[in-house]
Amino acid sequence: MRHFIRSAAVAIAMATASTFTLSAAIAADLSGAGSTFIYPVFAKWADTYKKDTGVGLNYQSIGSGGGIKQVIAKTVTFGATDKPMSDADLEKNGLVQFPMVMGGIVPIVNLTGVKPGELVLDGKTLAQIYLGAITTWDDAAIKALNPSLTLPSTAIAVVHRSDGSGTTFNFTNYLVKLSPDWKDKVGSDTAVEWPTGVGAKGSEGVANTVKQTDGGIGYVEYAYAKQNNLSYSKMLNAAGKVVEPSLESFGAAASNADFKGAKNFNVIITNEPGDTTWPIAASTWVLIHKAPDDAAATGEALKFFAWAYKDGKETAKALDYVSIPDSVVDLIKASWKADIQAGGKPVYAGE
């Protein structure tokens, strides 16, 4: 996404690193870093929030791993990650986490003559492609899923993330659930030892590399596929149904997320049941310090998140993200008041 935001003091163009800056005449602009998955909606929210409140926001779309490192190092007010931190790591680093949005990860392909949503894949076949066991697009396993589609003999060019990525975590978490070979040989994390393929930095890098590579395949958050006019695949889900990526299919997966019953809101939503469920769904969590050094900046950040939960729903919907239910938002705000404090008082003063 190409987007320029200007103010009297700064004119920054978003490029490969996808850093957007909204400048405001306040002592402490909001600052965050991490997930590329949430970046498209963060960018839109930031635009509107600037117009509504005059408060600036700087968010670096550098991947979940980078966001975790920066918030721990206190170089930003908040981090964003698509892989929730463990209870032990949250406690060790004095952090709290809460979900911001949910959405879908889609396989993207560059196949001449194949339109978005025409190709069908499943988890086992996707794992075999990323293991390097399936190497051409006319392989019998792919043809079996696409009997009415004429597939070329083009070599498959695998593209994966080169940076620490929550998108990679959820993608590989899904493959682990569908492929014993993948589980044994590769596993799931924000960064893995890829058996084959080339790495690209960020979702932007994956999207651009696939777009430029004949026979390419990669994985990105759905908004990147739409915004870059990339061909994406349908998927065979846990119920054995072929489904398209959409707000509805992501919502079906999200409906299984029991955030209320999960400590630290730690819920993974890959390969969930249901006829209409998209199988590679994911959430993004915000990470923020319990006892922040800059209470004012943290308070402003929490105001922004509260605004996004309430007034950012339509923007999220337009980009095919699923909003966090109001009942869960109430729990999140209660956790802010209980857990994020300075001088013995809650940093968040909202409702």
UniProtKB/Swiss-Prot annotation:
Phosphate binds at residues 35-37, 64, 82, 165-167. It is found in: Periplasm. InterPro entries: ABC_phos-bd_PstS, PBP_domain, Phosphate-bind_PstS. Keywords: Periplasm, Phosphate transport, Signal, Transport. GO terms for molecular function: phosphate ion binding. The keyword Signal applies. GO terms for cellular component: ATP-binding cassette (ABC) transporter complex; periplasmic space. The keyword Signal applies. Residues 1-27 form the signal peptide. GO terms for biological process: phosphate ion transmembrane transport. Belongs to the PstS family. Part of the ABC transporter complex PstSACB involved in phosphate import. PANTHER family: PHOSPHATE-BINDING PROTEIN PSTS. The complex is composed of two ATP-binding proteins (PstB), two transmembrane proteins (PstC and PstA) and a solute-binding protein (PstS). This is Phosphate-binding protein PstS. The gene is pstS.
